[in-house]
Amino acid sequence: MTQPIARSIPLQVVSGDTAAPASLQTGVKQIGGDKINRSPVQFVDAPVLRKPSWIRVRIPSGNAVQNLKAKLRENRLVTVCEEASCPNIHECFSHGTATFMILGEVCTRRCSFCDVAHGRPKPPDASEPASLATTVADMGLKYVVVTSVDRDDLRDGGAQHFVDCISAIRASAPKTRIEILTPDFRGKGRMDRALEILATSPPDVFNHNIETVPDLYPNVRPGADYQWSLTLLQRFKAQHPTIATKSGIMLGLGETMEQVQVTLRDLRAHDVDMITIGQYLQPTPHHHPVMRYWTPEEYKALEEYGNALGFSHVASGPMVRSSYHADRQAAGAGVAA
């Protein structure tokens, strides 16, 4: 059996008084150290842990990646594959698939695991839904994932823009199945508004990532709330019983097997149908360190545990991401493409 790789990382919590002051200009990205160094969570003396053999990524040859990037730039579109430095970008792009990120490239949150830029976002681009729909139709995609940055500056958290994108895609590519990966719509009245808006044109799959176990939220997802995310998933399912719900969790941030199992049970108790489980990889030295690399055997054990809980589909493996092979996951859960 493969031996787990583990170590302890010191975490230093910096108060708001001593954290670097924020200087935000609309549309300007804060990335890497500029982003994390202004967060209330800092990481001290955390050397990079050597990646085990099962984390290696094969980079395919050919021009497919550059061709798809050119198509995206032509239509002024952004993919989370690029913005979040996803390790599967070459495989997905070489197969002509992508997860589109709407509502800009600047997020209002500073999650310590995420490589998407922080800052003050620009207003939503009213032409984006049409551009997205045109690209989806031109690429002949059978299944598309649409996600976004957090937009705490918007009263509906960006829900109307999601609906506009769904409607535009269905008009241009009616056979395309649509999965949305949404933020948490956290804030007074925001979840209510978002769910009401999404009900006007719901997706084929509703995905919202729980990301980590509740004990790690203060260091990993500052600004988010574990129970809020569970409630969002459950409320959407209650409104749309026939639409598949989905969530995802990262491993390697300091969680235990027992904590992960509890989180999986919580997700099932809140009527989540599908789950993705994958290894966290540190985007830059400024981000949350990798506490350990979970082994392939452990991912297999979690897959079996999730299946026993009654998830309709469990994708569990070191390189699994929430939208990686999303079409296959949806097909496994009965969502026809």
Curated annotation (Swiss-Prot):
[4Fe-4S] cluster 2 binds at C107, C111, C114. It comes from Xanthomonas campestris pv. campestris (strain ATCC 33913 / DSM 3586 / NCPPB 528 / LMG 568 / P 25). Belongs to the radical SAM superfamily. Lipoyl synthase family. Pathway: Protein modification; protein lipoylation via endogenous pathway; protein N(6)-(lipoyl)lysine from octanoyl-[acyl-carrier-protein]: step 2/2. It catalyses: [[Fe-S] cluster scaffold protein carrying a second [4Fe-4S](2+) cluster] + N(6)-octanoyl-L-lysyl-[protein] + 2 oxidized [2Fe-2S]-[ferredoxin] + 2 S-adenosyl-L-methionine + 4 H(+) = [[Fe-S] cluster scaffold protein] + N(6)-[(R)-dihydrolipoyl]-L-lysyl-[protein] + 4 Fe(3+) + 2 hydrogen sulfide + 2 5'-deoxyadenosine + 2 L-methionine + 2 reduced [2Fe-2S]-[ferredoxin]. Binds 2 [4Fe-4S] clusters per subunit. One cluster is coordinated with 3 cysteines and an exchangeable S-adenosyl-L-methionine. GO terms for molecular function: 4 iron, 4 sulfur cluster binding; lipoate synthase activity; metal ion binding. Its main location: cytoplasm. PROSITE patterns: RADICAL_SAM. It is found in: Cytoplasm. Residues 93-312 form the Radical SAM core domain. NCBIfam families: lipA, PRK05481.1, PRK12928.1. Pfam families: LIAS_N (PF16881), Radical_SAM (PF04055). Its EC number is 2.8.1.8. This is Lipoyl synthase. The keyword Metal-binding applies. [4Fe-4S] cluster 1 binds at C81, C86, C92, S323. One of its GO terms (cellular component) is cytoplasm. Its cofactor is [4Fe-4S] cluster. The keyword Cytoplasm applies. It is an enzyme of class 2 (transferase). Keywords: 4Fe-4S, Cytoplasm, Iron, Iron-sulfur, Metal-binding, S-adenosyl-L-methionine, Transferase.
